């Protein structure tokens, strides 16, 4: 393992299995949560370097609620967040604008399902090596005695 820990929050077991296998084959440690509630609990239990969340879960666009909640949390707001969705394929709805603009979505990366393996891995690498991730790592090291 390369030491990087990823939390994957998605309610589709088949999709979760596929993404988990891709990430583990690339030597990432992956913890899975099948609901936002499980995801929040996992974030309280452990430390992660990246969160990947689906937009559509449960009763609707719960992934957006997860993203907003994480970005408002003092401890978790710098944790890189990658949102993946099949919403355009399912509904024809398309997110317009700059994904990094605060009024768009509070995420650091956005991919549409189905996601090509190389595109996913490149985006994960990019987010794990961003300046934001480096800041988070420094903060964690500074907290240790």
Regions found by a protein language model. Give the residues of each.
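His-Asp phosphorelay/catalytic-motif detector in bacterial-type signaling
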Residues: 47-49, 74-80
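Short hydrophobic/Thr-rich beta-strand motif most characteristic of the beta2 strand and flanking loop
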Residues: 27-35, 42
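Active-site beta3 strand of CheY-like receiver
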Residues: 47-53, 57
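Charged docking surfaces used in two-component/phosphorelay signaling
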Residues: 17-25
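Short acidic/polar segment at the start of the alpha1 helix of CheY-like receiver
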Residues: 12-18, 117
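The C-terminal output helix
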Residues: 122-140
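Alpha4 helix (beta4-alpha4-beta5 surface) of REC/receiver domains from two-component response regulators
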Residues: 61-65, 88-111, 118, 122
